Amino acid sequence: MSSASDLLIVGADGNPLDGPPPVPPALAVLPLRETVPFPDLVIPLAVGQERSLKLLDDVLSADRRFVMVAGRDPGVEAPGPEQLYEIGVIGTIARLMKVPDGSTRLLVQGGQRVRITRWTQREPYLVATIEELPDVVQESDELTALVREVQRTFLEIVESVPYLPEELRLAVANIEDASQLSHLIASALRITPAEKQQLLEQPDVELRLRRLVQLLARELDVISIGTRIQDQVQSELDKG
């Protein structure tokens, strides 16, 4: 998983751009199951449904952009507008590979956070009008302290659990942008999709970091309890 600082933003012609292109008034919408997208990150996706493959074919011939939106119920395979969250992320196809089983695997570069304002098409795939939801950030000593606390706690978690790759440690330690840091950690942390969505929907970076502090503290508590249980079990086995 990469931060925005590691990525090269390209246009429809494949040439580098100076920054994210302006948000268009409408885009195709790709529903996601069990995945909450975040800005600044590269997101691996596997697509197999006919309507999703049609969407990809069409956006590839345009500017390669679409909106990624998480479904409210991961058990629904083909959610309609009523079963999707209103806030998602613009994605740009960075790499695409078709596999023998007929599905497509792709890497999508997360862009701006957007809100769906109106659904304009349901077939052959979803299309909606959108508006950008930019971050609200005010530099302060409080924000700096929150960034340091989030980094410190997350790095402690990385050293304690196997599900977080070691390269995350270096990435988190070197990110200076508070918003990018929050997106990376929110995506990597083992929390529920609903909790990830709440973090995505929070435009105030300071409030987002405060919520992350709470979630990170909870994860540390869970890790501590798990370690204590393992120690107790091992002690009983040694006695036996």
Annotated model-derived regions:
Residues 1-240:
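N-terminal low-complexity, acidic/polar interaction/targeting segments
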